Amino acid sequence: MCGIAGWYRRGGRMVPGDAIVAACDRLKQRGPDDSGFLVEGDFGFGMRRLSIIDIAGGRQPIFSPDGRHAIIFNGEIYNHPELRRELAGSYDFRTDHSDTE
């Protein structure tokens, strides 16, 4: 079990970063092992993580290789080892075992 929080403000108004942190702090019981946040202008999201798969390398948010895109993921992809092998030639994985990447 993990927890995700997000905030979007229309009209280009800045999202208060401390509000995302506070929202995720309220989710600590859902994910006591780790937290991660991203605030960019009018959008922000954060997460609390219960570390099960790739405890050290699965920190979030995870960014695309060019840094333009970020993801926070809550779920499990059970066949991620097979998918990783299948995509190995076309994607440069940065973690060893994360099912998010």
Task: Please identify what each model-predicted range represents.
Residues 1-101:
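N-terminus-centric sequence/structural signature that marks the extreme N-terminus
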